[in-house]
């Protein structure tokens, strides 16, 4: 099954970032305050304005992004955990 995001939504695959302190203690996701990282899998066409114009999404498939811990909606597709996130919930693109 494939997902095609609508409007200004973006499908993101969360990257596994094991968080450790300098001494090697693993910090669980529930205690981490840093934003999560992910890779953009698919991008919607953009958000429609009141006059009917489409504002394209400023991301593309393959971009590495930062997003908040509670951003988006989690979905499982073919056993893979993905997030459907609005463009405005993405904090930054990692370059």
Swiss-Prot record:
Protein name from the UniProt record: Co-chaperonin GroES
The entry's keywords: Chaperone, Cytoplasm
Protein family (similarity comment): Belongs to the GroES chaperonin family.
Organism from which the protein derives: Bordetella petrii (strain ATCC BAA-461 / DSM 12804 / CCUG 43448)
Keyword Cytoplasm: yes
Gene Ontology CC terms: cytoplasm
GO molecular function, one term: metal ion binding
NCBIfam families associated with the record: PRK00364.1-2, PRK00364.1-5, PRK00364.2-2, PRK00364.2-4, PRK00364.2-5
Superkingdom assignment: Bacteria
Gene Ontology BP term (one): chaperone cofactor-dependent protein refolding
């Amino acid at each position: 099954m494939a997902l095609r995001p609508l409007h200004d939504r973006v499908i993101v695959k969360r990257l596994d970032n094991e968080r450790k302190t300098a001494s090697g203690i693993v910090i669980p996701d529930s205690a981490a305050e840093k934003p999560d990282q992910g890779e953009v899998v698919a991008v919607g066409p953009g958000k429609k304005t009141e006059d009917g114009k489409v504002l394209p999404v400023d991301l593309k498939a393959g971009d590495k992004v930062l997003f908040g811990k509670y951003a988006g909606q989690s979905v499982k597709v073919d056993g893979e955990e993905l997030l459907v996130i609005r463009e405005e919930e993405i904090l930054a693109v990692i370059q």
